[in-house]
């Protein structure tokens, strides 16, 4: 790579990125700017400042991005009822474009000519970070140490850290056997026993949710108020986007909601098993579909479902900043103008049950849909012509002797 003068590093303060920090300083003889994001991962971010200072970093960014994350990334994604491969709520995927955006903003502010991240060469995150970076700053240099160095085991990283006096904790609390990623939307677990697809996940792995068997024996009722497709209040109390999600995480976790054990297809080609806890997101998805069920036109709803598969794939594979994702987002957002109202849910032992939905913009007409006398609101005789017209092409084919089986 051409000469690098200053690098902005996505820095957590953990072993991997602390080693990367020193490795960048030594390998490229460059100045390193650290960026640590608070996305609601539930860990203290300030210790990263002390570690960076101890390693000679002069420019340190620690940003609370929780509101921006939920408002500008999570909520827009949930307007589309987004699910990857039928199950995954994209908790890791949706955080990466925001981190990439902030890396580029800091690079512009500090005059850095490169960015760096700690994603490995096997995963999706390297693609997500770098596609976002190139979309926002085409000429930026990207340094991905895991694709360059030979420190390919935790033990080698530990040895490197000790050799270079990098402040780490070799002894202390027991390290989790899983590779984990967390933000306000979810926490994920990979590796360890999960690499055997037949081995059941361990109960003590889960951090956010109670086991459904241990959840309360009494159901929790909850009302979610929607405006233009986004939740603006819980049980009538107005809340910011981040507060909404944090509250739903807490309530959902207490009721054993949001656990998932899946094998997904990574963009780089391999299959990967992961376990996820997404309590708030699971509640949001069910509630959003419920409010849309009474406020969206049928064909708009069906078209949204068709587009969602592509939209989910774009987010999963790192194309959040692509023109096609932006185009789809405009269509999705336009569909949400009338998605207003209240959804009532019952949460019970891992289940999210819709018990009511209402809206001033509802397209549900009880006078037409009733099983009782509709007083002439709907003429059932009209159905005969409707059915004959829709059967016409099949009748023609049958008259021609076309066989169906």
UniProtKB/Swiss-Prot annotation:
InterPro entries: Arginosuc_syn_C (IPR048268), Arginosuc_syn_N (IPR048267), Arginosuc_synth (IPR001518), Arginosuc_synth_CS (IPR018223), Arginosuc_synth_type_1_subfam (IPR023434), AS_cat/multimer_dom_body (IPR024074), Rossmann-like_a/b/a_fold (IPR014729)
Record-stated family: Belongs to the argininosuccinate synthase family. Type 1 subfamily.
Spans through the membrane: none
Annotated HAMAP family: Arg_succ_synth_type1 (MF_00005)
Record: residues binding ATP: 10-18, 37, 118
Complex and partners: Homotetramer.
Chain's gene name: argG
Chief localization: cytoplasm
Alphabetized Pfam families for the sequence: Arginosuc_syn_C (PF20979), Arginosuc_synth (PF00764)
Organism field: Pseudomonas syringae pv. tomato (strain ATCC BAA-871 / DC3000)
Protein name per its UniProtKB record: Argininosuccinate synthase
EC number of the protein: 6.3.4.5
PROSITE patterns: ARGININOSUCCIN_SYN_1, ARGININOSUCCIN_SYN_2
Record's keyword terms, sorted: Amino-acid biosynthesis, Arginine biosynthesis, ATP-binding, Cytoplasm, Ligase, Nucleotide-binding
Reactions performed catalytically: L-citrulline + L-aspartate + ATP = 2-(N(omega)-L-arginino)succinate + AMP + diphosphate + H(+)
Any GO molecular function: ATP binding
Stretches assigned to coiled coil: none
Location in the cell: Cytoplasm
Chain positions recorded as L-aspartate binding sites: 120, 124-125
Binding site for L-citrulline: 88, 93, 124, 128, 179, 188, 264, 276
GO biological process terms, semicolon-separated: argininosuccinate metabolic process; L-arginine biosynthetic process; urea cycle
Pathway(s) this gene product operates in, as recorded in its UniProt entry: Amino-acid biosynthesis; L-arginine biosynthesis; L-arginine from L-ornithine and carbamoyl phosphate: step 2/3
